[in-house]
Amino acid sequence: MNKKLLFSFLAFLGVVSVKAQRNELGVRLGMSNLVGDVGRTNYILQKPLDLSRASDWGIPFYGGLLYRFNFNPHQTVRLDLGYNQIQFSDKAAKEDYRRNRNSYGKNNVYEASLMFEYNFFPVNNEQISMLSPYIFGGVGALMFDAPKATLVNDFRRDADGVAQAPINELDFTTTTDYSLGKKVTMHIPFGVGLKYKFNHSWAIFAEATFRYTLTDQLDYSKILSKDVKTSFNADILDPATGGSLLQSGNYYAVSKEREAEFIKKRNIGDDRSNDWINTFSLGLTYSFGRPPCYCE
């Protein structure tokens, strides 16, 4: 008897969930741009940097997938997964100090966002030829490339490459090796759009998305101290420690001073403001599942 009741209850839940189901799957294509400490500062629809070098730079592209669950004709929860290729170059900036600085680069940014969407008109109803503006906002995560560096401390060398003992604590070289590593941060996406339902199951939309990120590293303008490593050549050892002479005493103190000076000179821009990624996109969605019963 208990098994029959359990089966009946589960079947009832299944019927309710099917009747309440109204899903949309879609794709979005568009263009993304960065607003940060390097490059242009207009918030949307920045031009590609140099189409003649598209084979090297690519284009500032956005591509994504989305899923919508419509609670009623106006309210929707949606999940976005996307890829942004963003570019930035001080040569394209309006500010003289940026053009004189001439920093540049590109970044590959992957995103996942969960958002609430509100349609001003009942575009999620069954009827076709419905048009509605909408607003949305939520939270999400970004995975991006961030700068890293290794400061290589080495002895001065003679013409044959043989390490020379330092004559004082400043008599050694420090060079920098740069690299990129993946990082994850949060972002706050929001925006506006316009949705047109031209068929019982199909709709097109256009939207502008603004993402306030919780990082200042998307344009490589900032490197964190934890991302700066040091290495020490061990051709000459300290008899007391058995390690590199450059890792002992005043040599090590000088290496730390050089590390701090490197970080200070390497970081540019306003470290009190974070970066934005903004996108203008066009999309197409397909609705499936039985229409919900929007009961009063």
Describe the predicted segments one by one.
Residues 32-62, 66:
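Surface-exposed strand-loop-strand hairpins of Gram-negative outer-membrane beta-barrel proteins
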Residues 37-44, 89-96, 127-128, 146-154, ...:
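Outer-membrane beta-barrel translocator domains and adjoining extracellular loop/strand segments
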Residues 21, 57-61, 108-112, 131, ...:
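Residues that define the transmembrane beta-barrel architecture of outer-membrane proteins
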Residues 20-22, 73-74, 122-131, 149, ...:
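Short loop/turn motifs that connect adjacent beta-strands in outer-membrane beta-barrel proteins
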Residues 198-296:
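Predominantly the C-terminal beta-signal and adjacent terminal strand-loop region
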Residues 31-35, 83-87, 120, 139-145, ...:
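Transmembrane beta-strands of outer-membrane beta-barrel pores
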Residues 27-31, 65-69, 114-118, 137-141, ...:
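Residues on the lipid-exposed face of transmembrane beta-strands in outer-membrane beta-barrel proteins
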Residues 47-53, 97-105, 121, 174-180, ...:
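Extracellular loop and loop/strand-boundary signature of outer-membrane beta-barrel proteins
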